Regions:
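Conserved N-terminal catalytic/coupling substructures associated with nucleotide/phosphate chemistry
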Residues: 1-123
Length: 123
């Protein structure tokens, strides 16, 4: 019996309060809101390169990591630390971003009109 990849095991759980799937990172401000929400609650994981239905699409380039880094450094106050791991799953790259619950909360991030708001992650 083939052992399940750790990322496939996470995907099998489906999205919930501590797990979010992102097809791609195209908006650093939007990702900053997700980083802040995880940091302000119980922490969590972002799986970049995974569609909402759980299908693995893979990340397209190194730029995805740099957009997450920019989101944290430029658009979260105080900055939300994160750890990122690249995984190869069935020939596709998935970027796992772990955000711990923060001792420095509340963290804020800009809304769609650039007002910095305190956000939380709910189920």
């Amino acid at each position: 019996m083939k052992k399940m990849h750790p990322i496939e095991a996470l995907i099998e759980q489906g999205e919930h309060q501590q797990l979010d799937f992102k097809f791609e990172v195209s908006d650093s401000k939007k990702i900053a809101r997700t980083l802040s929400a995880f940091a302000n609650t119980d922490g969590g994981r972002l799986l970049i390169g995974v569609k909402d239905n759980g299908n693995i699409s893979g990340v397209r380039s190194e730029e995805e990591y740099y957009m997450i880094e920019a989101a944290s450094k430029m658009y979260t106050r105080p900055e939300v630390p994160f750890e990122a791991t690249r995984w190869e799953v069935n020939g596709k790259t998935v970027l796992e971003v772990y955000i711990a619950p923060s001792p420095d909360k509340p963290h804020t991030a800009p809304d769609k009109v650039s007002r910095f708001l305190e956000l939380i992650k709910s189920a």
